[in-house]
UniProtKB/Swiss-Prot annotation:
Organism: Rice ragged stunt virus (isolate Thailand) (RRSV)
Protein name from the UniProt record: Structural protein precursor VP8
GO BP term, example: proteolysis
Molecular-function GO terms, alphabetical: peptidase activity
Sorted UniProt keywords: Capsid protein, Hydrolase, Protease, Virion
Length: 596
């Protein structure tokens, strides 16, 4: 859809919202969440939903967090919200190297009354985001809609906007767009057109587009600051990253400010400096062979090596993630396998039918995989007697319900275009992650029923020498060498979520400072892995990388085209790092309901 079509869609969207509430019941008040959900109903593309979601909706809702219907576009705050939506279009549909259309204004933008070939979105910033008070009245006047005016519902094929010419209800696209998109309309989203690079546009890594700070017109990104604080904590500030033409970005272009780095009078480090600085500190730990205690399965005999269980018998979450990202669906065989694992987890199969031999005892010990946060281990979920321990591990029935829901939501979004279900998918998927690996930012582990992939080039400490030549699989946890670059470069080799889990429970990450830095590593590793399809030693393993819409909308066609895809990572990581209370509450509710 071209810029003209998108501008018309914005206008049509607000008109439909206004129209649907022109006869509100007495004292009808809708919360900003309800209106926001309705707004998303009218938006076709996932990246648009993500972009609008990053806009300043809280500002629109005012202090009481509520607004009255119909839309009061005479209200300056609501006009600002409209402008924020247009701002998203400006940032995502910017053109460079074209002749500006000097006399454009907000009214012409909304009406689509301009020549798109001559139009430069950059010019609009001085109008829709005015710094000059003289432009304020003009901007508001252009955006006002008579809210008291009641019009009959338009016919199906057209919508009339306050004396203006009718707008077709179908998407208004150029001929070239229609040719490209005609074969893809059946999907929830479409592959976005590559856009020209514009060095004046800066895309915030966590979602909201902003003007380059060097420019004269800057839209305050309050939501970006809020998300940054929620994800990383108040001590970390994620700066802006220049938008490339296509593909991935270099991590060295970002600057991170960590509050604790003020101790040496240095406020800003680029990513390499941050890594080097932490490497120096972690090397000190590694050279002294400092180990990290992890709840482990104690062998009955110290001479018995605890073998890693067979990979085929364990739940391969990484494969599941990749399948969902690439095709947006889960196959019946996978569901059956997951159900089998849950059944095994729920019953008595962890220690069963093993011969009384060294090998049998090793297998039996290795499969005692249910471990609570306190390090206690049980043969299976049903073997847990204490109520306090029971609540630390979700009932397998909940896991099975999540799996069923996940499949249902995936199918409905992909096949039936139920766009609002995308949020539910993200929630269900993140809940599943929390069930499997616990809260990632609490340094606690609820259950450990996965296997580390067999990787030959695992960085280890010097104490690993005693394990060389053995058949015990990967070295013990405390012998794996931890450095930031290890995290960055080994992400593709190792189970993604297992890496996050290990970092979260690593005692060397126990301080707020280290935890914040760890989250930076995770964010950058995700970005590097997904945005760079030719990441060394990983392309052959994982194949082409889909966009982050694979996490939040489970699309089947979207491929990364530019940094705007990072917008989809923000809510995902936000949920990942705030799962603790949600999962714990679900566990407590489930335990209470089952009479435990």
């Amino acid at each position: 859809m071209n810029t003209k079509g998108f501008a018309q869609k914005i206008q049509r969207t607000f008109h439909l919202i206004h129209q649907s509430h022109y006869t509100p019941p007495p004292n009808k008040i809708s919360t900003h969440v309800e209106i926001f959900s309705e707004l998303l109903t009218y938006v076709d593309y996932e990246w648009q939903r993500a972009a609008i979601g990053a806009s300043r909706w809280v500002e629109l809702a005012a202090e009481e967090n509520e607004i009255h219907i119909p839309f009061n576009t005479k209200d300056e705050r609501q006009v600002n919200f409209l402008i924020a939506i247009i701002h998203v279009a400006i940032s995502l549909y910017s053109n460079s190297g074209v002749e500006p259309f000097a006399d454009c204004d907000l009214e012409k933008i909304l009406n689509g009354d301009y020549e798109s070939s001559k139009f430069d979105w950059n010019v609009v910033f001085d109008i829709v985001l005015p710094n000059d008070v003289r432009l304020k009245e003009k901007t508001l006047k252009a955006a006002v809609v008579e809210e008291e005016r009641v019009e009959p519902r338009p016919k199906r094929r057209e919508i009339t906007l306050g004396g203006q010419r009718p707008l077709q209800t179908r998407d208004v696209r150029s001929d070239s767009d229609l040719i490209v998109l005609s074969k893809l309309e059946a999907y929830d989203d479409v592959v976005e057109r590559p856009r020209q690079n514009n060095t004046d546009i800066i895309i915030h890594r966590l979602g909201l587009a902003k003007m380059n700070p060097a420019s004269n017109s800057i839209l305050p990104a309050k939501i970006s600051r809020i998300i940054t604080e929620q994800v990383f904590g108040a001590g970390v500030n994620v700066d802006y990253i220049a938008r490339p033409t296509e593909g991935f970005i270099s991590l060295s272009t970002a600057t991170y400010t960590v509050a604790s780095y003020f101790e040496r009078g240095i406020a800003n480090y680029d990513i390499n400096a941050v890594l080097d600085n932490i490497i120096d500190k972690t090397d000190q730990l590694n050279t002294t062979d400092t180990v990290v205690e992890l709840p482990s399965i104690p062998p009955e005999d110290s001479s018995i090596e605890v073998a890693t269980p067979s990979h085929e018998t364990f739940f391969d979450i990484n494969t599941m993630i990749y399948i969902i990202m690439c095709c947006g669906s889960i196959t019946n065989p996978m569901i059956q396998r997951l159900n089998g694992i849950v059944t095994r987890y729920n019953t008595t199969n962890y220690v069963v039918s093993y011969p009384d031999t060294d090998d049998g005892r090793k297998k039996a010990l290795a499969e005692r995989a249910v471990i609570t946060v306190d390090g206690k281990y049980y043969k299976c979920y049903n073997d847990i007697k204490a109520d306090t321990d029971k609540r630390r591990i979700l009932n397998p029935a909940v896991i099975k319900e999540v799996m069923i829901s996940l499949r249902h939501y995936c199918g409905s979004v992909i096949h039936y275009r139920e766009r609002m279900e995308a949020t539910h998918i993200s929630q269900v998927f993140c809940l599943l992650m929390g069930i499997c690996y616990g809260g990632l930012d609490t340094k606690k582990i609820r259950c450990r029923w996965f296997e580390w992939p067999a990787v030959s080039n695992v960085p280890v400490t010097s104490s690993y020498a005693e394990f060389k030549g053995s058949n015990s699989g990967l070295p013990p946890y405390q012998c794996r060498k931890f450095t930031p670059r290890t995290v960055m470069t080994s992400f593709a080799h190792w189970n993604l979520w297992a890496w996050m889990l290990d970092l979260a429970i690593d005692k060397r990450m126990s301080s707020d400072r280290h935890l914040s830095i760890m989250k930076i590593y995770v964010l950058n590793a995700f970005s590097h892995l997904v945005l760079n399809s030719s990441l060394e030693n990983s392309a052959n393993i994982l194949g082409p990388f889909p966009s982050f819409s694979g996490y939040t909308a489970f699309t089947s066609t979207s491929i990364v085209r530019d940094v705007s895809s990072c917008q989809r990572l923000a809510p995902f990581l936000l949920r990942m790092f705030s799962l603790v209370d949600y999962v714990a509450a679900a566990a407590s509710s489930e335990a209470s309901g089952s009479g435990v």
